[in-house]
Amino acid sequence: MQEKKTALSAGASGIVGRGIAERLVGDGWRVLCASRSGGGHLPGTEGVAVDLLDAEACARAVAPHAGITHVFHAAFQPAPSRAAEVAPNLAMLRNVVEAVQQASPALRKVVLVTGAKFYGIQWGASSTPCRESDPRQLPPNFYYDQEDWLREASRSARWRWVNLIPPFVSGYAVGNPMNLVLGIGLYAAVCKELGMPLRFPGSVGAYEALHQIADARQIGAAAAWAADAPAAEDEAFNVT
């Protein structure tokens, strides 16, 4: 009988995390969704109430789940500045992985999802195409801290890691304003109500610029592949 894989999904209430959780459930996984309330999780998943910023709380919440085989991390904690984002976002990843590592000897893969800021788009124009081998841009950037921590922590661990790097992401999530599709939909609705044509609201430069968008379902498929693919170990992969 084939072993049923068990995932702990951090950030499952967001667009990316939801896309991953839906894909895993469809593939027959047992999926635990970590959130502060432990509720509001997707059909077919189980809620785990935990504050990811609290290391002791993470350890207590994960302790009953000794069979976790994979961690999927797409959680994000906003902060007033790039520098201020580093500590909480690194802490959430570290707290989750260390808690699972302690509770579950079955852990074998950590799949981190970062994003296009890995290539410095927040600072202006970036190279096209972006490649995983591109040099890092000006720090601070919590994506770099997260990947560096995984690389170092995995050296003496049984588990391996993967960093998935998508561009702009579209998809569905409840109560999440970080959604390009939602913004376009609201703009279109306002234009319709006012009887205005749906014109591009930005500059000529923005209109003519090359952009890529990944659907959350595509990221979910990539995460499911990265979970067990022999080629997906200890490196980053663009998802476009």
Q: What do the PLM-derived regions correspond to, one by one?
A:
Residues 2-27:
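N-terminal Rossmann NAD(P)H-binding glycine-rich loop of SDR-like oxidoreductase domains
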Residues 10, 202-209, 235-240:
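Glycine-rich Rossmann NAD(P)(H)-binding loop
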Residues 28-40:
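Conserved glycine-rich Rossmann-like NAD(P)H-binding loop of the short-chain dehydrogenase/reductase
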Residues 39-95, 101:
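NAD(P)H-binding glycine-rich loop region in Rossmannoid oxidoreductase-like domains
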Residues 71-73, 83-84, 91-142, 162:
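Conserved Rossmann-fold NAD(P)-dependent oxidoreductase catalytic core, especially the SDR/UDP-sugar
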Residues 219-240:
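Mid/C-terminal beta-alpha module of Rossmann-like enzyme folds, strongest
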